[in-house]
From Swiss-Prot:
Taxonomic source organism: Arabidopsis thaliana
Keywords for the protein's UniProt record, in alphabetical order: DNA replication, DNA-binding, Nucleus
Function of the molecule: Component of the origin recognition complex (ORC) that binds origins of replication. DNA-binding is ATP-dependent. The specific DNA sequences that define origins of replication have not been identified yet.
Tissue and organ distribution: Follow a cell-cycle regulation with a peak at the G1/S-phase. Mostly expressed in siliques and flowers, and, to a lower exent, in flower buds, leaves, roots and stems.
Biased composition (Polar residues): 12-24
CDD domains registered for this protein in UniProt: Orc3
Annotated GO CC locations: nuclear origin of replication recognition complex; origin recognition complex
Record note on quaternary structure: Component of the origin recognition complex (ORC) composed of at least ORC1 (ORC1A or ORC1B), ORC2, ORC3, ORC4, ORC5 and ORC6. ORC is regulated in a cell-cycle and development dependent manner. It is sequentially assembled at the exit from anaphase of mitosis and disassembled as cells enter S phase. Interacts directly with ORC1A, ORC2, ORC4, ORC5 and ORC6.
Subcellular localization, as worded in the UniProt entry: Nucleus
InterPro entries recorded: ORC3, ORC3_N, ORC_WH_C
Predominant localisation class: nucleus
Family under the similarity heading: Belongs to the ORC3 family.
Protein name per the record: Origin of replication complex subunit 3
Region (Disordered): 1-25, 532-554
Length: 734
């Protein structure tokens, strides 16, 4: 039997035979994709057609050696600080993530407690109504009772989310909460209610969670027997269906009918998550299944309410020190609304913004000290890691040069950082006061937060009389929030004003300057309340009633003017935009273009750019030193795509291949081949400067592989039947 060809010693055949013969194509094993050429050393001294390359050693000059030593030190420092920034990012983001999880858990805690109380009260009433005898409980068939006893107690939990992505974590938290209270809990998703698996798949899923993971029988009697063993009957059985509206209606109806037949032997509580309305199951369940449900309604907090709670905990309370600029906040709000208000999309945006900040800003390592509550670590340790290059970068920041801070004030850097750390305290108090006033007009904290971040503070124009007239004639969407707050003050009742002042007093309790201004409003508030009480006296003459009405309106107007004055005082004195503070770039992410590119993405543009700069991706030294010159050691796909830039919309495959072949076989190799054929005496030469050129079949295979990769990435369109020798470019430029 003839030996087969190997990679090192390919059989000699023509290009036509190698591509047309099916036997050769199946049995001939050739490397058709080469990332970088391997060393051309002669392994074991027996491989033919491979020659050794001469290794040339040059002693570097002292200047080059010194320069390379400095570059290596700088490279080590850069790697050290890059690693350090990534570690600080993990610290900062872990604190932000934990804060968000705690906020979401607390926002649903009341509803979760209400669901558990409802389960316990209903379970105790079922037990007290009359427990089954042991002989009846262990029977393998349901007990015949009245129709009312076949009602399946159901909790309809309204999530008010358009996307299920936010509900997944909510129902996981609900499952953990009920299990911690001693309930037997199983959770089913909409995937379990498929028409293919039927109700048997649902029953098997329940038995695997309740009884044993290896159960493969869809028999509800197993559940009944398990419930009466090992004191399992002392706790209720809860089944959670997290996304009812996506379930197969007939399968869910069959499961409800089966479980209701066993409701006496196994007190089962069904929790159904709905996102649109409490009566959504009417659209998917059968009439018989609906009659078996005894529903109780529960409503979770809305996505906007959860968003406000997260925003308050992350940006307005001491958390990590990280914040965003005005433009970034506007983009995050727009992205949040475009993603159907899903909190998961906002958290994802926040994480990418935080990661981009640490990757772009060298001074972001200082944020680690902002994570420590009540600990002043910015004076010594925070500035020890600042190298000369980092310090130069710090004093070249736009906020530093704008405030005319020079390098001579280096010792003041810790004080500037401490000011950054203390600044959010009064700032956040004012934002929360505005939020309390905006609640009467259903304003969201996210809208107020975005407008207050405006570095130009255009909202202050609304407090001058001339600008008030202009604002009434020219609507400005940017200042809409503050205008709405001021307008709503005129429509508030005395009780609403009193409630707002009480909340302001609680918010500003630790900040005496603002708290004193709020306390000064109490006498005016008492006058308004007194005027309101006189207006409400019974049997008062119409003349006195009209006087008291005008008196109340006068007192209310005076009161609202005083409140507007306090709001103006808070905004002017304490609402200093973060982008106007020196060194704010340390903790504030401002590059909205980077964030937009990371979120929305431009995969085709990214692929094109990587192909044109492949030496940076592969860290190839030989390619990067030659600049834009094409070399045989480059990636085949990168070579082919760079050659495609020289063609128009339509590329001739033959010309493209010849250009590709020219790169892989330099002119020096061709000249050597000619010299070898002409001079027989130099046939046994074993050492040459360059390796042997690849075979024609190998070049064609590499060309086909590179063209296929460009087609998969969507950069070219393959030949058509009309023009089989041409391909068309789909994307242009980089």
């Amino acid at each position: 039997m003839a030996p087969s060809g190997t990679v090192a010693d390919p059989p000699q055949c023509s290009t036509t035979d190698s591509f047309n013969s099916s036997d050769t194509a199946e049995n001939d094993i050739r490397p058709f994709f080469v990332l970088h050429k391997a060393s051309s050393g002669n392994h074991n001294g027996k491989l033919t057609g491979i020659v050794k390359s001469k290794r040339r050693i040059e002693s570097p000059s002292p200047k080059i050696a010194k320069r390379s030593e400095v570059e290596s030190v700088e490279e080590e420092d850069g790697q050290f600080f890059s690693t350090l920034r990534f570690k600080v990012f993990e610290t900062v983001w872990s604190k932000i993530e934990k804060t968000i999880e705690d906020v979401l858990r607390n926002s649903n805690s009341k509803v979760f407690s209400g669901i558990h109380d409802w389960i316990r009260e209903s379970f105790e009433s079922i037990i007290s109504s009359g427990a089954l005898k042991l002989s009846e409980a262990v029977r393998s068939y349901p007990v015949l009772t009245q129709a009312s006893s076949k009602q399946l107690l159901t909790a309809m939990v309204l999530t008010r989310n358009l996307e299920m992505v936010d509900d997944l974590l909510t129902f996981e938290e609900l499952e953990l909460h009920l299990k911690s209270q001693g309930c037997h809990v199983a959770k089913l998703s909409s995937m379990d209610f498929s028409a293919k698996s039927g109700v048997g798949g649902c029953l098997r899923g329940l038995l695997r969670q309740f009884v044993m993971p290896t159960v493969d029988v869809a028999d509800v009697t197993i559940l009944a027997s398990w419930y009466r063993e090992n004191k399992n009957h002392e706790n209720p059985v809860v089944i959670i269906v997290d996304d009812t509206e996506r379930c197969c209606g007939p399968v869910l109806s069959d499961l409800i009918l089966i479980l209701s037949e066993w409701a006496i032997k196994v007190p089962i509580f069904l929790i159904m998550g709905v996102s649109t309305a409490h009566d959504a199951p009417r659209k998917i369940l059968s009439v018989n299944a609906l009659q078996r449900l005894c529903a109780t309604r529960f409503t979770l907090s809305s996505p906007a309410e959860r968003m406000d709670a997260v925003l308050k905990a992350v940006f307005l309370k001491p958390c990590s020190g990280f914040t965003v600029s005005h433009k970034v906040a506007l983009f995050m709000r727009s992205y949040f609304l475009c993603q159907d208000g899903t909190l998961t999309s906002f958290v994802r945006t926040l994480k990418i913004a935080c990661l981009q900040h640490f990757s772009l800003e060298p001074l972001s390592i200082m944020l680690e000290h902002f994570c420590h509550d009540g600990v002043n670590q910015l004076s010594g340790e925070g500035t020890e890691l600042l190298t000369e290059a980092t310090m130069k970068h710090a004093f070249d920041l736009p906020s530093v040069t704008r405030n005319k801070i020079t390098r001579s004030t280096f010792e003041m850097l810790p004080h500037f950082l401490l000011d950054l750390q203390r600044m959010p305290n009064p700032w956040s108090i004012v934002v929360l006061c505005l939020y309390e006033a905006g609640k009467f007009d259903k304003l969201r904290l996210l809208d107020i937060f975005c407008e207050i971040l405006d570095p130009e503070a255009r909202y202050l124009k609304y407090f001058s009389p001339s600008e008030i007239v202009n604002s009434q004639s020219h609507n400005s969407g940017r200042n809409n929030v503050i205008r709405r707050v001021l307008r709503k003050l005129r429509d508030l009742s005395p009780s609403q004003l009193s409630s707002m002042l009480k909340s302001w007093e609680n918010l500003t309790a630790e900040f005496t300057e603002i708290n004193d201004k709020v306390i000064e409003l109490h006498p005016f508030m008492r006058a308004v309340e007194a005027a309101g009480q006189r207006q409400g006296l019974p049997n008062s003459p119409k003349k006195h009633a009209s006087r008291s009405n005008s008196k109340l309106e006068k007192e209310l107007k005076a009161m609202t003017d005083k409140v507007a004055t306090v709001i103006e005082f808070m905004l002017r004195e304490y609402m200093k935009p973060v982008e106007s503070v020196p060194f704010h770039e340390i903790l504030c992410f401002k590059n909205v273009d980077k964030l937009q590119s990371a979120l929305l993405g431009d995969p085709r543009g990214r692929i094109q750019l990587d192909l044109l700069e492949s030496h940076d991706i592969l860290h190839c030294v030989c390619c990067s030193q030659r600049g834009t010159t094409l070399l045989p050691s480059m990636h085949d796909t990168s070579i082919l795509y760079k050659l495609a830039q020289e063609h128009a919309d339509v590329i001739n495959l033959h010309d493209w291949y010849q250009s590709f072949k020219t790169i892989l076989i330099p002119r020096s190799s061709k000249a050597k081949q000619k010299s070898k054929s002409s001079s027989k005496s130099k046939k046994r030469k074993e050492i040459c400067e360059e390796p042997e050129a690849p075979a024609e079949a190998l070049i064609q295979a590499r060309f086909c592989r590179a063209v296929m990769e460009l087609q998969i990435t969507g950069l070219i369109r393959m030949p058509s039947k009309r023009r089989p020798d041409f391909v068309q470019r789909v994307a242009f430029g980089s």
